[in-house]
Amino acid sequence: MSKVALITGVTGQDGSYLAEFLLEKGYEVHGIKRRASSFNTERVDHIYQDPHTCNPKFHLHYGDLSDTSNLTRILREVQPDEVYNLGAMSHVAVSFESPEYTADVDAMGTLRLLEAIRFLGLEKKTRFYQASTSELYGLVQEIPQKETTPFYPRSPYAVAKLYAYWITVNYRESYGMYACNGILFNHESPRRGETFVTRKITRAIANIAQGLESCLYLGNMDSLRDWGHAKDYVKMQWMMLQQEQPEDFVIATGVQYSVRQFVEMAAAQLGIKLRFEGTGVEEKGIVVSVTGHDAPGVKPGDVIIAVDPRYFRPAEVETLLGDPTKAHEKLGWKPEITLREMVSEMVANDLEAAKKHSLLKSHGYDVAIALES
Protein backbone atom coordinates (compact mmCIF):
# COMPACT_ATOMS: atom_id res chain seq x y z
CA MET A 1 0.00 0.00 0.00
CA SER A 2 1.29 3.47 -0.90
CA LYS A 3 2.58 5.77 1.80
CA VAL A 4 0.59 8.98 2.25
CA ALA A 5 2.34 12.34 2.60
CA LEU A 6 0.89 15.75 3.46
CA ILE A 7 2.86 18.84 2.38
CA THR A 8 2.13 22.35 3.57
CA GLY A 9 3.41 24.97 1.15
CA VAL A 10 3.05 22.52 -1.73
CA THR A 11 2.78 25.30 -4.34
CA GLY A 12 6.12 26.80 -3.33
CA GLN A 13 9.60 26.00 -4.59
CA ASP A 14 10.39 23.20 -2.15
CA GLY A 15 6.84 21.88 -1.98
CA SER A 16 6.60 21.39 -5.72
CA TYR A 17 9.96 19.61 -5.98
CA LEU A 18 9.12 17.44 -2.96
CA ALA A 19 5.72 16.51 -4.41
CA GLU A 20 7.43 15.42 -7.66
CA PHE A 21 10.01 13.42 -5.71
CA LEU A 22 7.43 11.61 -3.58
CA LEU A 23 5.15 10.83 -6.52
CA GLU A 24 8.11 9.24 -8.29
CA LYS A 25 8.57 7.05 -5.21
CA GLY A 26 4.96 5.89 -5.38
CA TYR A 27 3.51 8.04 -2.61
CA GLU A 28 -0.01 9.41 -2.50
CA VAL A 29 0.62 13.12 -2.03
CA HIS A 30 -1.72 15.66 -0.47
CA GLY A 31 -0.84 19.34 -0.50
CA ILE A 32 -2.26 22.34 1.33
CA LYS A 33 -2.64 25.58 -0.63
CA ARG A 34 -3.99 28.95 0.44
CA ARG A 35 -7.01 30.49 -1.24
CA ALA A 36 -6.01 33.33 -3.56
CA SER A 37 -7.87 35.63 -5.93
CA SER A 38 -5.86 34.21 -8.82
CA PHE A 39 -4.46 30.76 -9.53
CA ASN A 40 -1.17 30.20 -7.70
CA THR A 41 -0.50 26.61 -8.70
CA GLU A 42 1.86 27.09 -11.64
CA ARG A 43 4.66 25.16 -9.89
CA VAL A 44 2.49 22.04 -9.57
CA ASP A 45 0.23 22.32 -12.61
CA HIS A 46 2.31 19.70 -14.44
CA ILE A 47 1.61 17.08 -11.75
CA TYR A 48 -2.01 18.02 -11.10
CA GLN A 49 -4.45 15.14 -11.55
CA ASP A 50 -8.16 15.54 -12.20
CA PRO A 51 -9.98 14.21 -9.11
CA HIS A 52 -12.45 12.52 -11.47
CA THR A 53 -9.73 10.28 -12.88
CA CYS A 54 -9.25 6.77 -11.57
CA ASN A 55 -7.17 6.61 -8.38
CA PRO A 56 -5.39 10.00 -8.51
CA LYS A 57 -2.17 10.24 -6.50
CA PHE A 58 -1.95 14.01 -6.11
CA HIS A 59 -4.56 16.01 -4.19
CA LEU A 60 -4.83 19.69 -3.27
CA HIS A 61 -6.68 20.99 -0.20
CA TYR A 62 -7.49 24.58 0.66
CA GLY A 63 -6.00 25.44 4.01
CA ASP A 64 -3.95 27.86 6.07
CA LEU A 65 -1.46 27.43 8.88
CA SER A 66 -3.37 30.06 10.86
CA ASP A 67 -6.56 27.92 10.94
CA THR A 68 -6.51 25.18 13.59
CA SER A 69 -9.86 23.61 12.69
CA ASN A 70 -8.91 23.47 9.03
CA LEU A 71 -5.59 21.75 9.71
CA THR A 72 -7.21 19.28 12.08
CA ARG A 73 -9.88 18.38 9.52
CA ILE A 74 -7.33 17.81 6.76
CA LEU A 75 -5.14 15.65 8.99
CA ARG A 76 -8.17 13.61 10.07
CA GLU A 77 -9.22 13.02 6.46
CA VAL A 78 -5.78 12.33 5.01
CA GLN A 79 -4.30 10.25 7.88
CA PRO A 80 -0.76 10.89 6.60
CA ASP A 81 2.26 8.72 7.26
CA GLU A 82 4.48 11.76 6.78
CA VAL A 83 3.89 15.50 7.19
CA TYR A 84 6.29 17.99 5.65
CA ASN A 85 5.74 21.48 7.05
CA LEU A 86 7.21 23.67 4.31
CA GLY A 87 4.57 26.41 4.44
CA ALA A 88 5.72 29.73 5.89
CA MET A 89 5.97 33.46 5.47
CA SER A 90 9.55 32.95 4.35
CA HIS A 91 10.77 36.36 3.16
CA VAL A 92 13.14 37.88 5.71
CA ALA A 93 12.67 41.50 4.61
CA VAL A 94 8.88 41.20 4.57
CA SER A 95 8.93 39.73 8.08
CA PHE A 96 10.07 43.13 9.38
CA GLU A 97 6.97 44.65 7.75
CA SER A 98 4.60 41.90 8.97
CA PRO A 99 6.09 40.53 12.20
CA GLU A 100 2.79 39.48 13.80
CA TYR A 101 1.61 37.58 10.72
CA THR A 102 5.03 35.93 10.44
CA ALA A 103 4.85 34.75 14.05
CA ASP A 104 1.30 33.45 13.62
CA VAL A 105 2.08 31.38 10.53
CA ASP A 106 5.69 30.31 11.07
CA ALA A 107 5.69 29.76 14.84
CA MET A 108 2.09 29.07 15.83
CA GLY A 109 1.36 27.27 12.56
CA THR A 110 3.95 24.66 13.46
CA LEU A 111 2.43 24.25 16.91
CA ARG A 112 -1.04 23.88 15.40
CA LEU A 113 0.14 21.02 13.20
CA LEU A 114 1.97 19.22 15.98
CA GLU A 115 -0.94 19.60 18.39
CA ALA A 116 -3.44 18.43 15.76
CA ILE A 117 -1.34 15.30 15.16
CA ARG A 118 -1.33 14.63 18.90
CA PHE A 119 -5.02 15.48 19.37
CA LEU A 120 -6.00 13.02 16.63
CA GLY A 121 -3.93 10.23 18.15
CA LEU A 122 -1.56 10.13 15.18
CA GLU A 123 1.64 10.71 17.15
CA LYS A 124 2.78 7.08 16.69
CA LYS A 125 1.72 6.87 13.04
CA THR A 126 2.69 10.21 11.54
CA ARG A 127 6.27 11.38 11.07
CA PHE A 128 6.77 15.15 11.05
CA TYR A 129 9.40 17.17 9.21
CA GLN A 130 9.84 20.85 10.08
CA ALA A 131 11.57 23.10 7.53
CA SER A 132 13.91 25.14 9.68
CA THR A 133 16.38 27.73 8.45
CA SER A 134 19.99 28.87 8.61
CA GLU A 135 18.60 32.30 9.56
CA LEU A 136 18.42 30.88 13.10
CA TYR A 137 22.19 31.40 13.32
CA GLY A 138 21.89 35.10 12.42
CA LEU A 139 24.75 36.82 14.21
CA VAL A 140 26.88 33.71 13.84
CA GLN A 141 28.67 32.33 16.89
CA GLU A 142 31.00 30.03 14.94
CA ILE A 143 31.96 29.28 11.34
CA PRO A 144 30.85 26.95 9.86
CA GLN A 145 27.49 26.43 11.53
CA LYS A 146 26.48 22.92 12.55
CA GLU A 147 23.68 21.28 14.55
CA THR A 148 25.26 22.28 17.88
CA THR A 149 26.03 25.92 16.99
CA PRO A 150 24.15 28.39 19.25
CA PHE A 151 21.32 30.32 17.61
CA TYR A 152 21.16 34.12 17.41
CA PRO A 153 18.19 35.09 15.18
CA ARG A 154 18.22 38.56 13.58
CA SER A 155 14.74 38.97 12.06
CA PRO A 156 11.09 38.35 12.98
CA TYR A 157 11.19 35.46 10.49
CA ALA A 158 14.17 33.85 12.22
CA VAL A 159 12.68 34.38 15.69
CA ALA A 160 9.41 32.74 14.59
CA LYS A 161 11.34 29.85 13.08
CA LEU A 162 13.30 29.49 16.33
CA TYR A 163 10.04 28.86 18.19
CA ALA A 164 9.04 26.34 15.51
CA TYR A 165 12.40 24.59 15.89
CA TRP A 166 12.14 24.23 19.65
CA ILE A 167 8.46 23.28 19.73
CA THR A 168 9.29 20.47 17.29
CA VAL A 169 12.07 19.28 19.61
CA ASN A 170 9.73 19.63 22.60
CA TYR A 171 6.96 17.51 21.07
CA ARG A 172 9.52 14.87 20.10
CA GLU A 173 10.85 14.69 23.64
CA SER A 174 7.52 15.15 25.47
CA TYR A 175 5.24 12.87 23.45
CA GLY A 176 7.61 10.48 21.71
CA MET A 177 6.66 11.84 18.30
CA TYR A 178 8.84 11.26 15.28
CA ALA A 179 9.47 14.96 14.68
CA CYS A 180 12.64 16.53 13.32
CA ASN A 181 14.09 19.78 11.99
CA GLY A 182 16.00 20.24 8.77
CA ILE A 183 18.12 23.38 9.18
CA LEU A 184 18.08 24.47 5.56
CA PHE A 185 20.71 26.83 4.26
CA ASN A 186 19.83 28.94 1.20
CA HIS A 187 18.58 26.82 -1.67
CA GLU A 188 17.44 28.07 -5.04
CA SER A 189 16.11 26.99 -8.45
CA PRO A 190 14.18 28.38 -11.41
CA ARG A 191 11.09 28.01 -9.19
CA ARG A 192 12.45 30.40 -6.57
CA GLY A 193 10.16 33.34 -5.84
CA GLU A 194 11.04 36.43 -7.85
CA THR A 195 11.55 38.67 -4.80
CA PHE A 196 14.32 36.48 -3.34
CA VAL A 197 17.78 37.83 -4.12
CA THR A 198 19.06 34.99 -6.31
CA ARG A 199 16.00 34.92 -8.56
CA LYS A 200 15.88 38.71 -8.53
CA ILE A 201 19.44 38.65 -9.88
CA THR A 202 18.98 36.02 -12.60
CA ARG A 203 15.71 37.54 -13.78
CA ALA A 204 17.08 41.09 -13.88
CA ILE A 205 20.29 40.07 -15.66
CA ALA A 206 18.23 38.31 -18.34
CA ASN A 207 15.95 41.33 -18.72
CA ILE A 208 18.90 43.75 -18.88
CA ALA A 209 20.59 41.56 -21.49
CA GLN A 210 17.46 41.80 -23.65
CA GLY A 211 17.06 45.56 -23.16
CA LEU A 212 13.97 45.26 -20.96
CA GLU A 213 15.60 46.78 -17.85
CA SER A 214 18.54 49.11 -17.42
CA CYS A 215 19.84 48.44 -13.91
CA LEU A 216 19.58 45.91 -11.07
CA TYR A 217 19.43 47.42 -7.57
CA LEU A 218 20.65 45.34 -4.63
CA GLY A 219 21.39 45.74 -0.94
CA ASN A 220 24.45 44.31 0.80
CA MET A 221 26.58 42.65 -1.90
CA ASP A 222 29.17 41.62 0.70
CA SER A 223 26.72 39.17 2.30
CA LEU A 224 28.08 35.62 2.21
CA ARG A 225 25.77 32.65 1.73
CA ASP A 226 25.87 28.88 1.32
CA TRP A 227 23.66 28.24 -1.73
CA GLY A 228 22.40 24.84 -2.90
CA HIS A 229 19.73 23.52 -5.26
CA ALA A 230 16.22 22.87 -3.93
CA LYS A 231 16.09 19.49 -5.72
CA ASP A 232 19.00 18.21 -3.65
CA TYR A 233 17.54 19.57 -0.44
CA VAL A 234 14.07 18.00 -0.73
CA LYS A 235 15.71 14.59 -1.14
CA MET A 236 17.42 15.14 2.20
CA GLN A 237 14.10 16.15 3.77
CA TRP A 238 12.66 12.79 2.75
CA MET A 239 15.74 10.89 3.95
CA MET A 240 15.36 12.43 7.41
CA LEU A 241 11.96 10.76 7.84
CA GLN A 242 13.22 7.31 6.81
CA GLN A 243 15.52 6.79 9.82
CA GLU A 244 14.71 4.66 12.85
CA GLN A 245 15.06 7.62 15.22
CA PRO A 246 14.28 11.30 14.57
CA GLU A 247 17.21 13.70 14.51
CA ASP A 248 17.84 17.28 13.44
CA PHE A 249 20.22 17.92 10.53
CA VAL A 250 21.95 20.84 8.83
CA ILE A 251 21.26 20.77 5.08
CA ALA A 252 23.96 22.74 3.28
CA THR A 253 26.75 22.52 0.70
CA GLY A 254 29.62 23.66 2.91
CA VAL A 255 30.69 26.19 0.25
CA GLN A 256 30.20 29.95 0.49
CA TYR A 257 29.92 32.80 -2.03
CA SER A 258 29.06 36.50 -1.84
CA VAL A 259 26.04 38.12 -3.46
CA ARG A 260 28.51 39.95 -5.72
CA GLN A 261 29.98 36.64 -6.89
CA PHE A 262 26.49 35.35 -7.63
CA VAL A 263 25.87 38.44 -9.78
CA GLU A 264 29.14 37.86 -11.65
CA MET A 265 28.25 34.21 -12.31
CA ALA A 266 24.79 35.10 -13.59
CA ALA A 267 26.15 37.80 -15.90
CA ALA A 268 28.88 35.49 -17.20
CA GLN A 269 26.22 33.00 -18.32
CA LEU A 270 25.12 35.61 -20.87
CA GLY A 271 28.63 36.60 -21.91
CA ILE A 272 28.69 39.74 -19.77
CA LYS A 273 31.91 40.49 -17.88
CA LEU A 274 31.58 42.95 -15.01
CA ARG A 275 33.89 45.03 -12.88
CA PHE A 276 32.84 46.64 -9.61
CA GLU A 277 33.86 50.14 -8.55
CA GLY A 278 33.19 52.08 -5.36
CA THR A 279 32.20 50.89 -1.91
CA GLY A 280 29.02 50.75 0.15
CA VAL A 281 26.08 52.60 -1.36
CA GLU A 282 28.38 54.01 -4.07
CA GLU A 283 29.30 50.61 -5.49
CA LYS A 284 28.49 50.06 -9.17
CA GLY A 285 28.70 47.08 -11.49
CA ILE A 286 30.01 48.16 -14.91
CA VAL A 287 30.05 46.12 -18.11
CA VAL A 288 33.62 45.42 -19.25
CA SER A 289 32.83 43.30 -22.30
CA VAL A 290 30.03 41.36 -23.96
CA THR A 291 30.49 38.16 -25.96
CA GLY A 292 27.96 35.93 -27.70
CA HIS A 293 24.46 36.79 -28.84
CA ASP A 294 22.39 36.64 -25.63
CA ALA A 295 22.95 40.24 -24.47
CA PRO A 296 22.09 42.65 -27.30
CA GLY A 297 20.75 45.15 -24.79
CA VAL A 298 24.07 45.99 -23.11
CA LYS A 299 27.44 47.37 -24.16
CA PRO A 300 30.80 48.04 -22.48
CA GLY A 301 30.62 50.94 -20.05
CA ASP A 302 26.97 50.41 -19.09
CA VAL A 303 26.25 50.57 -15.35
CA ILE A 304 23.88 47.67 -14.78
CA ILE A 305 24.34 47.02 -11.03
CA ALA A 306 23.82 49.56 -8.24
CA VAL A 307 23.15 49.63 -4.50
CA ASP A 308 19.87 50.86 -3.01
CA PRO A 309 19.91 51.31 0.79
CA ARG A 310 16.22 50.34 0.89
CA TYR A 311 17.33 46.74 0.53
CA PHE A 312 19.53 46.75 3.63
CA ARG A 313 18.03 44.77 6.52
CA PRO A 314 17.45 46.49 9.88
CA ALA A 315 19.71 43.78 11.34
CA GLU A 316 22.03 42.24 8.76
CA VAL A 317 23.13 38.61 8.64
CA GLU A 318 26.62 38.96 7.18
CA THR A 319 27.70 35.35 6.76
CA LEU A 320 26.15 31.88 6.69
CA LEU A 321 28.11 28.70 5.99
CA GLY A 322 26.74 25.27 6.85
CA ASP A 323 28.61 22.16 7.94
CA PRO A 324 26.76 19.16 6.42
CA THR A 325 29.12 16.56 7.94
CA LYS A 326 26.38 14.87 9.98
CA ALA A 327 24.16 14.49 6.89
CA HIS A 328 27.10 13.01 4.95
CA GLU A 329 28.13 10.58 7.67
CA LYS A 330 24.74 9.43 8.98
CA LEU A 331 22.57 9.47 5.86
CA GLY A 332 25.09 9.45 3.03
CA TRP A 333 23.60 12.64 1.63
CA LYS A 334 25.58 15.15 -0.37
CA PRO A 335 24.49 17.81 -2.88
CA GLU A 336 24.80 16.80 -6.53
CA ILE A 337 24.18 20.11 -8.33
CA THR A 338 26.94 22.73 -8.18
CA LEU A 339 26.29 26.44 -7.77
CA ARG A 340 27.46 27.18 -11.31
CA GLU A 341 25.13 24.52 -12.71
CA MET A 342 22.25 25.97 -10.71
CA VAL A 343 22.99 29.55 -11.80
CA SER A 344 23.16 28.39 -15.42
CA GLU A 345 19.77 26.69 -15.10
CA MET A 346 18.17 29.74 -13.47
CA VAL A 347 19.58 32.21 -16.02
CA ALA A 348 18.53 30.00 -18.95
CA ASN A 349 14.99 29.84 -17.59
CA ASP A 350 14.77 33.61 -17.10
CA LEU A 351 16.43 34.33 -20.45
CA GLU A 352 13.75 32.30 -22.23
CA ALA A 353 11.04 34.45 -20.62
CA ALA A 354 12.97 37.67 -21.36
CA LYS A 355 13.33 36.75 -25.03
CA LYS A 356 9.57 36.24 -25.30
CA HIS A 357 8.96 39.66 -23.76
CA SER A 358 11.56 41.21 -26.06
CA LEU A 359 9.89 39.69 -29.11
CA LEU A 360 6.51 41.09 -28.06
CA LYS A 361 8.07 44.51 -27.48
CA SER A 362 9.71 44.47 -30.93
CA HIS A 363 6.27 43.93 -32.48
CA GLY A 364 4.81 46.99 -30.77
CA TYR A 365 3.24 45.41 -27.71
CA ASP A 366 3.56 47.06 -24.31
CA VAL A 367 5.52 44.75 -22.03
CA ALA A 368 5.19 45.42 -18.31
CA ILE A 369 8.03 43.84 -16.34
CA ALA A 370 7.02 43.40 -12.70
CA LEU A 371 9.84 44.71 -10.53
CA GLU A 372 10.32 44.65 -6.77
CA SER A 373 9.69 48.10 -5.31
From Swiss-Prot:
It holds the Pfam family GDP_Man_Dehyd. Its cofactor is NADP(+). It is an enzyme of class 4 (lyase). This is GDP-mannose 4,6-dehydratase. It catalyses: GDP-alpha-D-mannose = GDP-4-dehydro-alpha-D-rhamnose + H2O. NADP(+) binds at residues 9-14, 64-65, 86-90, 101, 161, 187, 192. The active site is at T133, E135, Y157. Changing E135Q: Strongly reduces activity. Homodimer. Catalyzes the conversion of GDP-D-mannose to GDP-4-dehydro-6-deoxy-D-mannose. Its EC number is 4.2.1.47. CDD domains: GDP_MD_SDR_e (cd05260). Disulfide bonds: none annotated. Keywords: Lyase, NADP. One of its GO terms (molecular function) is GDP-mannose 4,6-dehydratase activity. Belongs to the NAD(P)-dependent epimerase/dehydratase family. GDP-mannose 4,6-dehydratase subfamily. Changing K161A: Strongly reduces activity. GO terms for biological process: 'de novo' GDP-L-fucose biosynthetic process; colanic acid biosynthetic process. The keyword NADP applies. Pathway: Nucleotide-sugar biosynthesis; GDP-L-fucose biosynthesis via de novo pathway; GDP-L-fucose from GDP-alpha-D-mannose: step 1/2; Exopolysaccharide biosynthesis; colanic acid biosynthesis. InterPro entries: GDP_Man_deHydtase (IPR006368), NAD(P)-bd_dom (IPR016040), NAD(P)-bd_dom_sf (IPR036291).
